[in-house]
Amino acid sequence: MQTQHREGGAPAPDTRSGADDMIRVLPRRTVLEQPAGCGDDPCPPPSRPQEFRDWFEREGYVLVRGAIPPRLCQAGIDAFRAEVLGDRLGFFERHVSGKFERHQYTPGGYMKYPIMNLQDLASRRHAGFRRAGLTVLTHPAIQRALTVLTGEAARCVHTMYFDGNQVTWAHRDGHYIDSRNDGEMIGVWVAAEDIHPDAGRFFILPRSHRMRVPGEEGDPNSAQYKARMADFVRDGPLDCVAPVLRQGDLLMWKSMVIHGSLPTTDERWSRRSFTAHYVPLSHPYKWNVRSAQSARSLRFNRVEVMLHAVDGTRVARLRNHVRSEWPRAYGAARALWQGLRPGA
């Protein structure tokens, strides 16, 4: 279900500095829709559990067609468009910066930078989107597939929603967040709509979880890391696979598999999708780019979902409440504070 018209009115200019320049790194020229030598949809289904697990362990990813009912995917899109896309005052936690920022829009009018941690959306204005997104990401089909892969139930530690395409750099999730048992976290990506080839498809390097990239140690947010990963994708020995993904399709991958997104070549197209990361219930999780992890969680659809909002003090709780419910006042106060800081 694609839309070609612009949404959200005239797009606000993207005022982010040149940070994007260093992440717009292209994968190799030959991008495959399935692994070389395979026919269409080579991945075994979860109903063949041993083959499903063997493929996942060997290739590092697996694709489940039609896992999520289209009506639930569409409900998530509709709630986003009704409650979030046009909210020009609201502050949302962003993937690239890790900060709470207002929307930036693509030339096609889509939200450029994805929202992180839907479970932490506190405003009543966004309650429908929060509920619809978590309904998709905790769906029983996902839980069944996770149980087949891990042998136990799993805990959701992180969520995201994409509307437009920020062009995510090639990376390993495990360099940012993972299970305490390194490499045991599983990523989940649900296509909320049919993803057009020109929208910037998700790409993955099968079997990359078994290979090291020279110089990949260090800060995974640095320009050097992103350049080394880009070089490996472009010039390394592994295929770059960007599967055709349709509404309701589910892609799952190991935390040390290299993946990212292709650049958008036609700004008319969105790439609406929901993402989550899961660890087995018997495993603690860890942040590799944050000083501490939250111990708080909620239960949704019988699934434990970790909360990450920093609200350990009265001041933090007050700040979060003002940011959620009175974003105009919060924005004015933040601008004033930043103007008063030394060196501003």
PLM region spans:
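Extracellular structured ligand-interaction cores
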Residues: Y61, G183-W189, A199, C240-A242, ...
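Non-heme Fe(II)-dependent double-stranded beta-helix
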Residues: D14-R58, R65-H171, Y176-D178
